[in-house]
A protein has these predicted regions:
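Bacterial N-terminal signal peptides
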Residues: 6-16
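Elongated alpha-helical scaffolds
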Residues: 117-119
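Hydrophobic alpha-helical segments
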Residues: 341, 364-367
Length: 391
């Protein structure tokens, strides 16, 4: 449920619900406005389109990876001119210190040359004290199988290695190159009926650690597939634990996942088509999942990436609202907090014609930082990545 804070809308459940986390007069929109006013642009001036950032924060620096292009606003896996780039931001001063493209179509590396195609949906992991590992998909829809690659970034020299390495997908049938065909085959063997596509397999909600293991939510956006995976110790193979795509009548994508206080897994899934509202599914073991269903604390979601994090001892659920500001898509984003994953309060409400979409949140030394896609002119508003302090 969402508690009746100022700017919060509905109450579900009984009067015996836990004590409120926020003051009765808390203004979620005012809090969101204050955050947005202090954001800084991390995108280079020549960039026309930028989207889907992820980041890690190490030794006072935010390392932000993003897909970008210098041709037009927006993004598409069918645009071979989309590349992936890294921005380094000092979190104390919010100053952008470095920007570097690390993979693009037909780029020549020491051990391989990338084929023609978009470099898409980058993800970043701190592998050890000296190394960041960055993953991305190389895609050319309807022409070849997409492949997920990775390369390492040395924190001491602040430089990328000049080699690419293939990531792998472990399924019930064995270990394969990380390509959509194997992800689909594993789901199909368990009754998944949507057709296979040759692109769209991404590391989506990443990376989350529980009981000494590292997990990630896998996604095939055009294929409507979702699964929980565990990452091996070498950080090069993703083992599918369980798929959560039911009911088959809904096309569900781009999930975010976390574990509740009793150990139950819970995922929130984006919905394409239908009423476009988010659905939720749970699992006791990460392998067998309940049929997705709507929950009352998300009454009017829109088709966009959700977030589901644990920060400062609370759960944080971020979701795109279907309400539009002056007709702008993805112009309202809610960020709710909870102690138990059931009783929710609205802490931030971001309303802007610049859009507020695909945010990423990271806790570092007692503060929470965010990166988010915004724009001014293109209808998609996928033009730049903003960075700043949430609280």
């Amino acid at each position: 449920m969402i508690r009746p804070i100022l700017m919060s809308f509905w109450t579900f459940g009984l009067a015996s619900a836990p004590a409120a986390l926020l003051p009765a007069d808390w203004n979620a929109k005012a809090a969101g406005d204050e955050v947005m006013a202090a954001l800084v642009n991390t995108t280079e001036p020549q960039v026309k389109g930028a989207h889907d950032a992820e980041m890690v924060i190490v030794k006072g620096k935010a390392y932000i990876v993003v897909e970008a292009n210098d041709v037009q606003g927006g993004e598409s896996a069918e645009w071979p001119f989309i590349y992936v780039t890294l921005s380094v931001v000092d979190v104390a001063t919010l100053k952008v210190e470095k920007q570097q493209v690390f993979a693009r179509s037909e780029q020549v590396f020491e051990n391989v040359t990338l084929p023609v195609g978009a470099c898409f949906v980058p993800r970043i992991l701190q592998k050890d004290d000296q190394t960041l590992r960055i993953y991305f998909a190389s895609e050319a829809p309807k022409k070849r199988q997409a492949q997920t690659w990775y390369l390492d970034y040395d924190l001491t020299t602040q430089s990328f290695e000049n080699k690419l390495h293939k990531a792998y997908l472990k399924t019930a049938s064995g270990t394969h190159e990380m390509q959509p065909q194997y992800f689909h085959a594993d789901a199909a063997a368990q009754g998944f009926t949507r057709p296979a596509v040759d692109f769209g397999l991404y590391l989506f909600d990443s990376f989350k650690s529980f009981d000494g293991k590292l997990y990630v939510a896998l996604n095939n956006y055009p294929g409507g597939q979702n699964a929980l995976a565990v990452v091996n110790e070498a950080r090069d193979t993703f083992e599918v634990l369980g798929h959560y795509n039911e009911p088959g009548t809904l096309k569900l994508t781009e999930s975010a996942v976390n574990r509740l206080p009793d150990g139950t897994w819970m995922a929130i899934c984006r919905q394409e088509g239908g009423n476009r509202n988010y659905t939720f599914t749970t699992s006791r073991d990460g392998r067998t999942w309940t049929v997705n269903e709507h929950k009352p604390w998300v009454p009017n979601g829109a088709s966009s990436k959700p977030t589901f994090d644990q920060m400062k001892g609370l759960y944080w659920l971020g979701w795109q609202e279907s309400t539009q500001i002056n007709g702008v898509s993805r112009s309202v984003f809610n960020l709710d907090i909870s102690e138990d994953g059931t009783n929710w309060e609205r802490k931030y409400r971001f309303e802007t014609e610049k859009s507020f979409q695909y945010p990423v949140f990271r806790e570092y030394e007692g503060r929470i930082y965010l990166g988010v896609t915004q724009g001014d002119r293109d209808p998609s508003r996928k033009e730049r990545i903003m960075f700043g302090v949430l609280e």
